[in-house]
Amino acid sequence: MTTDTTGRTGNPAAAASPERFRYGFLKGNPQLTKNGELKHLLSIEGLPRSIVNHILDTAEQFVSVTDREVKKVPLLRGKSVFNLFFENSTRTRTTFEIAATRLSADVLNLNINASSTSKGESLLDTINNLSAMHADLFVVRHASSGAPYLIAEHCAPHVHVINAGDGRHAHPTQGLLDMYTIRHYKRDFTKLRVAIVGDILHSRVARSDIHALTTLGVPEVRAIGPRTLLPGGLEQMGVKVFNNLDEGLKGVDVIIMLRLQNERMSGALLPSAQEYFKTWGLTPERLALAAPDAIVMHPGPMNRGVEIDSQVADGPQSVILNQVTFGIAVRMAVMGIVAGNSD
């Protein structure tokens, strides 16, 4: 489903074709002020490298906060952060809540099932009412691609919007925390070969990661998966496409595994989960094809025995749990940059 200009739901084709890599509602760069400062974080696509690096540098400063006895800084004291999750989430919602709390913000988690949207109220009417409650920052997850853009366009001028995942389009904070994780372990993006493996067609994380990797100068990004799960337009982005996992993994420095997003699939795109694992699952034997010091990442939720073997997920080259830890600092950085200096 997608959101029309009234905030109601409709046909996803109205916003974008799922087979295309780029989305049609991206006009200009509504994330930036006239001075080039970050007002909203809606997508990594179109962000200058300087802003991406600024977010990563700021996150590095916040990592140390988690090691303190008092895990708080006053950057968002007096600010109100509303978490608006129209889709279910565990890691993203929890880490945003922790991040906002550590910035000393007041945090409200909207119960969507009990809200007026479940009674037929339009998305924009909900947003306008919440803006009238003097919200400063909306963190939005929505099943419709483009919903955070709609909210950013129509919310009160003092309100900032962070996209916590919209349909198949983007998950910018996941992309940023993935970049922070890669930088932490590999330092220099300009010498890396990065493989993204699995259901790329339905993955907003893959889109955000690809935009971030190319923005930061990674010379070789590989997309590996079945033909039925690869979107069009990857080659035009400079991405190398592989339909054979063993070939695609040879010599890579970073492996980002993706789950099968069965909830977004229509029709039978794949055989059984067991058959998928035989062909596309990351096992210790396949991991050995990568560089000896390669790291393994996964945005979660992880399906063991489908896209990844437990020996790999729990092995010494896995940095999956560290991604979650770094995610708090990255989301602190994004909220601090977007809303910390606003009036």
From Swiss-Prot:
It catalyses: carbamoyl phosphate + L-aspartate = N-carbamoyl-L-aspartate + phosphate + H(+). Carbamoyl phosphate binds at residues 91-92, 141, 171, 174, 300-301. It is an enzyme of class 2 (transferase). Pathway: Pyrimidine metabolism; UMP biosynthesis via de novo pathway; (S)-dihydroorotate from bicarbonate: step 2/3. GO terms for molecular function: amino acid binding; aspartate carbamoyltransferase activity. L-aspartate binds at residues 119, 204, 259. NCBIfam families: asp_carb_tr, PRK00856.1. Heterododecamer (2C3:3R2) of six catalytic PyrB chains organized as two trimers (C3), and six regulatory PyrI chains organized as three dimers (R2). Belongs to the aspartate/ornithine carbamoyltransferase superfamily. ATCase family. This is Aspartate carbamoyltransferase catalytic subunit. It comes from Burkholderia ambifaria (strain MC40-6). The gene is pyrB.
